[in-house]
Amino acid sequence: MKIGIIAYQGSFEEHYLQLKRAFDKLSINGEITPVKIPKDLKDIDGVIIPGGESTTIGLVAKRLGILDELKEKITSGLPVMGTCAGAIMLAKEVSDAKVGKTSQPLIGAMNISIIRNYYGRQRESFEAIIDLSKIGKGKANVVFIRAPAITKLWGKAQSLAELNGVTVLAEENNILATTFHPELSDTTSIHEYFLHLVKG
């Protein structure tokens, strides 16, 4: 199994280490590769779009010609996990808590609506315990950094975990979106769930 991680910015290293742990836990012989240009998408079984700044990631991906290719592969069934800014990239509708609608480049493959900076600047980062029973796991302490929120889901998109009634983990077919940073968590639960998604 070969997993690609979009490597423009964001926590590539942390996702790499968390994936390695998940591979070990599930006894999977896995390979992890950085993805920057279209040819890097060749022969991968799944892809992770990490956190960072979603507008920057989108603009760089567009400039390097990978944005449309990613969208095509994801809509054709390539398993993807987007975390924080990565979840924003996957959403069909994006607005900002302060400035309203945005016109940033998006993959836009998932039937969710996201509000950027949902918790406000005063809550730059915080930790919270969420219930992962819908993915067959227990409670987990997770990290939110300038986090967005999934405020609406439609079609086949479904909420897998909430915080105070707001969706923080969602799935639609081959797509997994988290508004928190699972790579900074003590548990590999989210990465393990993603690998199950990849295995099919």
UniProtKB/Swiss-Prot annotation:
<keyword id="KW-0456">Lyase</keyword>
<feature type="binding site">
    <location>
        <begin position="52"/>
        <end position="54"/>
    </location>
    <ligand>
        <name>L-glutamine</name>
    </ligand>
</feature>
<feature type="active site" description="Charge relay system">
    <location>
        <position position="181"/>
    </location>
</feature>
<feature type="binding site">
    <location>
        <begin position="145"/>
        <end position="146"/>
    </location>
    <ligand>
        <name>L-glutamine</name>
    </ligand>
</feature>
<feature type="active site" description="Nucleophile">
    <location>
        <position position="84"/>
    </location>
</feature>
<dbReference type="Pfam" id="PF01174">
    <property type="entry name" value="SNO"/>
</dbReference>
<comment type="similarity">
    <text>Belongs to the glutaminase PdxT/SNO family.</text>
</comment>
<dbReference type="GO" id="GO:0005829">
    <property type="term" value="C:cytosol"/>
</dbReference>
<dbReference type="GO" id="GO:0006543">
    <property type="term" value="P:glutamine catabolic process"/>
</dbReference>
<protein>
    <recommendedName>
        <fullName>Pyridoxal 5'-phosphate synthase subunit PdxT</fullName>
        <ecNumber>4.3.3.6</ecNumber>
        <ecNumber>3.5.1.2</ecNumber>
    </recommendedName>
</protein>
<dbReference type="GO" id="GO:0008614">
    <property type="term" value="P:pyridoxine metabolic process"/>
</dbReference>
<keyword id="KW-0315">Glutamine amidotransferase</keyword>
<dbReference type="GO" id="GO:0036381">
    <property type="term" value="F:pyridoxal 5'-phosphate synthase (glutamine hydrolysing) activity"/>
</dbReference>
<keyword id="KW-0378">Hydrolase</keyword>
<comment type="pathway">
    <text>Cofactor biosynthesis; pyridoxal 5'-phosphate biosynthesis.</text>
</comment>
<dbReference type="GO" id="GO:0004359">
    <property type="term" value="F:glutaminase activity"/>
</dbReference>
<dbReference type="GO" id="GO:1903600">
    <property type="term" value="C:glutaminase complex"/>
</dbReference>
<comment type="function">
    <text>Catalyzes the hydrolysis of glutamine to glutamate and ammonia as part of the biosynthesis of pyridoxal 5'-phosphate. The resulting ammonia molecule is channeled to the active site of PdxS.</text>
</comment>
<feature type="binding site">
    <location>
        <position position="116"/>
    </location>
    <ligand>
        <name>L-glutamine</name>
    </ligand>
</feature>
<feature type="active site" description="Charge relay system">
    <location>
        <position position="183"/>
    </location>
</feature>
<keyword id="KW-0663">Pyridoxal phosphate</keyword>
<dbReference type="GO" id="GO:0042823">
    <property type="term" value="P:pyridoxal phosphate biosynthetic process"/>
</dbReference>
<dbReference type="InterPro" id="IPR002161">
    <property type="entry name" value="PdxT/SNO"/>
</dbReference>
<comment type="subunit">
    <text>In the presence of PdxS, forms a dodecamer of heterodimers. Only shows activity in the heterodimer.</text>
</comment>
<dbReference type="InterPro" id="IPR029062">
    <property type="entry name" value="Class_I_gatase-like"/>
</dbReference>
<dbReference type="InterPro" id="IPR021196">
    <property type="entry name" value="PdxT/SNO_CS"/>
</dbReference>
